[in-house]
C-alpha cells in the first residue's frame, strides 16, 4: 500500500504516521524508560511536550544522558531561517530548548541563517534577511533563555570565526551528498551549495556532544554531520525530534507562513486570533448541537484540542477533563475553541511584553553575555 504522507525538510504533506516515520528515517522512539532517566537526571517533572510525546523520536539521546550522568555534559544547538513573521509552530523547538537549558544548565547556540534565506530566494535582499533576523531574535529572546549561557549569532556577522572549520567540513562533503539532502540541483547557486557546511559548524562549537531539538522534518540535514563528525575529531550530533503542531485547517501537513489561514502569528491581535480559531480551526465535532450532544466529538482530529494537548494546557488533569467532556458531548466545539482562544491570547500578550523587553537584551545575547564574549574570541578550526 502506498504511503499517504510525505515528510522532507522542504515539504510536509498528508496525515503523518509518526511510527512509520521513525522506521523510515531510522531514528529511535522516545521510550518511557528514556523519559524516566531524563526525569531522574534533572530531579524534576518532565516538560509537557515530553510527557505527551510531542518530542517523540531521537538519535543518541541515551548517549546525551550517559554523558550528563558521567559529568561530561553536553550543549544545545538550534536555529532559525529568518522570515517576515514567526508563527506559534516556530516557537516549539525554542520553548523546549529553553527548558532543556534550564534543567540541565547547559550552553545554547542559536544560529540565525540570514545568508541561507538570502541565497534560497531570488527575490530577497540581504538587507531584508538581516532586518527579519533582528525581529525574529526578539521573539527568540522572549522565550526566556539564559543570557550568559546563550549565544545568538547571524551567519553574515560570525562567518570569520566559523570559516576555517566550515572549509574543513566542506572538503568532506560531495555535491552529490548535499544535493539529495538539501533539495539542490544544477541550477542552484554556489552559495547555497556551500551553506550546508556552515550549518554543521555549530555542532562542533564544543568538544562535547551536541543535542539538536527540532521538527522531525529537519532530521535529514544532520545525517551529513553524523557521517563526517568523527573523522574531524568531533561527536556525532544527537537529536530529539518533535511532531508538527497541526495547521488550523486540519490534521494534515504543517503550518505555513505563506498560508495565513493555517497559522497563528506571534503578531496576531486578540480579535484576529479569535476570528482565525473560530473560522478555520478544523473541528472534530458533529454537524449539529443535537448530534454532538448525542454522539460527542473526536478530539483526535480536532485542531483546537490538539493545540491544547500539545502546547497550551500543561495541566494533565485539566486536559483529561476537556477530552472527556468533548468525547461525551458535554462540551461543544465552540466552547472548546473558546478555551484555546483564551489560552492563546494570554500567551501572546505575555510574549509581546517579553518581546518588548528583549530589545534591551539583543546585544547581551549576541555580543556581551558571558558565552557570547567567549565565542567572539574564538576561531573555530
UniProtKB/Swiss-Prot annotation:
Motif range ('KMSKS' region): 254-258
Enzyme Commission code: 6.1.1.2
Annotated compartments: Cytoplasm
One GO cellular component, as annotated: cytoplasm
A Pfam family assignment: tRNA-synt_1b
Entry keywords, A to Z: Aminoacyl-tRNA synthetase, ATP-binding, Cytoplasm, Ligase, Nucleotide-binding, Protein biosynthesis
Main subcellular location of this protein, as a coarse class: cytoplasm
Main enzyme class: ligase
BP GO annotations: tryptophanyl-tRNA aminoacylation
InterPro entries per UniProt: aa-tRNA-synth_Ic (IPR002305), Rossmann-like_a/b/a_fold (IPR014729), Trp-tRNA-ligase (IPR002306), Tryptophan-tRNA-ligase_arc (IPR020653)
Catalytic activity: tRNA(Trp) + L-tryptophan + ATP = L-tryptophyl-tRNA(Trp) + AMP + diphosphate + H(+)
UniProt motif ('HIGH' region) ranges: 82-90
Gene Ontology MF annotations: ATP binding; tryptophan-tRNA ligase activity
NCBIfam families cross-referenced by the UniProt entry: PRK12285.1-1, PRK12285.1-4, trpS
Similarity section: Belongs to the class-I aminoacyl-tRNA synthetase family.
Protein name: Tryptophan--tRNA ligase
The organism of origin for this protein: Sulfolobus acidocaldarius (strain ATCC 33909 / DSM 639 / JCM 8929 / NBRC 15157 / NCIMB 11770)
Amino acid at each position: 500500500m502506498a504511503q499517504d504522507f510525505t515528510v522532507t525538510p522542504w515539504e510536509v504533506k498528508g496525515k503523518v504516521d509518526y511510527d512509520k516515520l521513525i522506521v523510515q528515517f531510522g531514528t529511535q522512539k522516545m521510550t518511557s524508560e528514556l523519559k524516566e532517566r531524563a526525569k531522574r537526571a534533572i530531579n524534576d517533572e518532565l516538560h509537557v511536550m515530553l510527557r505527551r510525546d510531542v518530542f517523540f523520536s531521537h538519535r543518541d539521546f541515551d548517549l546525551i544522558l550517559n554523558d550528563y550522568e558521567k559529568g561530561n555534559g553536553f550543549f544545545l544547538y538550534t536555529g532559525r531561517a529568518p522570515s517576515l513573521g514567526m508563527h506559534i509552530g516556530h516557537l516549539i523547538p525554542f520553548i523546549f530548548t529553553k527548558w532543556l537549558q534550564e534543567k540541565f544548565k547547559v550552553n545554547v547556540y542559536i544560529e540565525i541563517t540570514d545568508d541561507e534565506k538570502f541565497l534560497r530566494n531570488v527575490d530577497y535582499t540581504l538587507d531584508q534577511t538581516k532586518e527579519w533576523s533582528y525581529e525574529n531574535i526578539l521573539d527568540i529572546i522572549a522565550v526566556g533563555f539564559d543570557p550568559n549561557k546563550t549565544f545568538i549569532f547571524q551567519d553574515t556577522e560570525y562567518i570569520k570565526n566559523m570559516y576555517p572549520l566550515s572549509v574543513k567540513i566542506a572538503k568532506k562533503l560531495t555535491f552529490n551528498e548535499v544535493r539529495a539532502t538539501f533539495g539542490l540541483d544544477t541550477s542552484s547557486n554556489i552559495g547555497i551549495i556551500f551553506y550546508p557546511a556552515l550549518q554543521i559548524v555549530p555542532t562542533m562549537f564544543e568538544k562535547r556532544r551536541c543535542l539538536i531539538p527540532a521538527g522531525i522534518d529537519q532530521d535529514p540535514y544532520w545525517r551529513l554531520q553524523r557521517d563526517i563528525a568523527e573523522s574531524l575529531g568531533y561527536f556525532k550530533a544527537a537529536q530529539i525530534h518533535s511532531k508538527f503542531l497541526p495547521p488550523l485547517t486540519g490534521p494534515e501537513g504543517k503550518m505555513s507562513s505563506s498560508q495565513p489561514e493555517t497559522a497563528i502569528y506571534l503578531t496576531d491581535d486578540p480579535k484576529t486570533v479569535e476570528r482565525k480559531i473560530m473560522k478555520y480551526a478544523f473541528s472534530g465535532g458533529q454537524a449539529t448541537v443535537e448530534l454532538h450532544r448525542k454522539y460527542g466529538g473526536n478530539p483526535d482530529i480536532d485542531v483546537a484540542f490538539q493545540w491544547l494537548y500539545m502546547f497550551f494546557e500543561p495541566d494533565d488533569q485539566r486536559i483529561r477533563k476537556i477530552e472527556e467532556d468533548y468525547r461525551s458531548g458535554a462540551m461543544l466545539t465552540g466552547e472548546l475553541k473558546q478555551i484555546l482562544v483564551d489560552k492563546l491570547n494570554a500567551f501572546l500578550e505575555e510574549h509581546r511584553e517579553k518581546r518588548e523587553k528583549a530589545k534591551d537584551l539583543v546585544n547581551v545575547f549576541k555580543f556581551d553575555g558571558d558565552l557570547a564574549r567567549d565565542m567572539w574570541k574564538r576561531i573555530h578550526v
